[in-house]
Amino acid sequence: MKSILVKDIYRNTEKYAGQEIVIEGWIRTLRASKAFGFIEVNDGSFFKNIQVVFEEGLENFAEVSKLSISTAIIVKGKLEITPDAKQPFEIKATSIEVEGESDSDYPLQKKRHTFEFLREIAHLRPRSNTFSAVFRVRSLAAFAIHQFFQERGFVYTHTPIITGSDAEGAGEMFRITTLDPKNPGLNEAGEVDFTKDFFGKETSLTVSGQLQGEAYALAFRNIYTFGPTFRAENSHTARHASEFWMIEPEIAFADLQDNMELAEEMLKYIINYVMENAPEEMEFFNSFVDKGLLDRLNNVATSDFGRVTYTEAIEILQKSGETFEYPVAWGTDLQTEHERYLTEKVFKKPVFVTDYPKDIKAFYMKLNEDGKTVAAMDLLVPGIGEIIGGSQREDNLALLEERMDAMGLDKEEYWWYLELRKYGSARHAGYGLGFERAIMYLTGMSNIRDVISFPRTPKSAEF
C-alpha cells in the first residue's frame, strides 16, 4: 500500500476517514503504558504532527513502546475521526515497522532549546517546530517570488557567481584564486601577478548580479535574478551574513516611480501568498516568536506605502526631539534607528525614502537635476528598517563615466557595462531584496543565522 502524506490527511480528512492508510515519518513524542501508547509522528510534509495510537495487541508492542524520539517508522492503520479530543483525528495502528532507529542521546528532546544551541546542531534543527516552520515559509516565499515575476512576463536570468567586477564598489569581496598562497608569483612591481591565475585576472564571488542583470534588461525589457551573493564584511550583527540570497529585478523603459511600484506590489504579493499557504506556520510564529506579527503583516499588505525624500526625512528626524545614538545630518547615511523611527513612529507603515545624496550611493545611480542627489530609493518597514534598496540607473554614458572617474573606478574593468549606454541606451531601474531579511520579516525571527539552513558568518563555516 502506498503511503500518504500527513499534509494530505489534514487537507482531505473526509476522503481518508475510516480508511486503512499508511504513513511514514519520524517520532516526535512517544508515551506508553502497559496496555496502550501514543506516538506523535511528523513526516516533514506538514507543520503539524499526526497522532498514532497503538495497543498491546500489536505484534511488536514492547519494542515500539521503547522507541526513541526521531526513530523513523512506517505506520499502517485506520484513520479515525476524534471530534471530542484535542486532535481532529488519529491513526489506530495495526502495524508499526521500524525503518531506522534513533540513539537515545538524540539532542532534540521534548523541551525548549535556545536558538544559540540549535545553531550548533544546524543539521538537526529543521526537525524542531520553529525551524520546520521557518524553512517551510522560506520555500513558499521563494516560490511566490518566482510566481510573481513569471506572471508578469519577466525573464529569469542567471548571472555569474564568479565575477571580475564589484557592483557595489565596496571592495569587501571574497577573492578567488588558484595561485599558491606560499608562492603566488610576483610581477615586476612586486605585486601578485594575477595574469598567471586561473582566469588571468583578479576575480571574486559576486556581491550582486545587478550589472549583468542590466545587460539582460536592455535585451528582454523585464528580468529578475534570484541567487546567492557574498560579502566579506567582518560583521557580527544579527542582520549580516557572508553568504545570502538576493532577488534583483531590472526593468527597462522605467524610472524610479515604476521601480517603487514594482517593489511594493512584489512585497505585498509575497506576504499574501505566505499567509494564505502557510496558515499553521504563521499562527505558530504569531504565538511563540513575535506576538504582533500577523497584525503587522496585514498592515503592510493593506497599506499604501509612504513616500518621503531623503532631505525631508532628515528634517523630520532633526525636528523629532528624539535622542539618536548616531547624529542626524544631511549627507550621512540613515542608520537603522533612524529608519525604524520613520517607519514605526512617523508613518506607522512601510515608507520609501528617495533621492539620496550622490556621495553616499553607488556609481551607477542616475544623477538628479539638482546635481547633488541621485534617483535612489530604500524601502523601510516597521520592525526592521531597510529591506529593499534600489535606483534608476544612469543611462547617460558621459555622466556615468564622469561619476566613475570621480570615484576612482577603473573604466576598463567596466568596458562592457559602459557599452550598454552606447547601443540603444534606455532609462531603466532595479532593486535588490535580501531574501533572508524578507524571511526574518515574514517570520519574526530576529537573527539572520536562523533563517539560513547552514549560515556562513565570520569565523563560522561549519557543516
Curated annotation (Swiss-Prot):
It is found in: Cytoplasm. Gene3D superfamilies: Bira Bifunctional Protein, Domain 2, Nucleic acid-binding proteins. One of its GO terms (biological process) is asparaginyl-tRNA aminoacylation. It catalyses: tRNA(Asn) + L-asparagine + ATP = L-asparaginyl-tRNA(Asn) + AMP + diphosphate + H(+). Keywords: Aminoacyl-tRNA synthetase, ATP-binding, Cytoplasm, Ligase, Nucleotide-binding, Protein biosynthesis. Transmembrane segments: none annotated. Belongs to the class-II aminoacyl-tRNA synthetase family. Homodimer. This is Asparagine--tRNA ligase. It comes from Alkaliphilus oremlandii (strain OhILAs) (Clostridium oremlandii (strain OhILAs)).
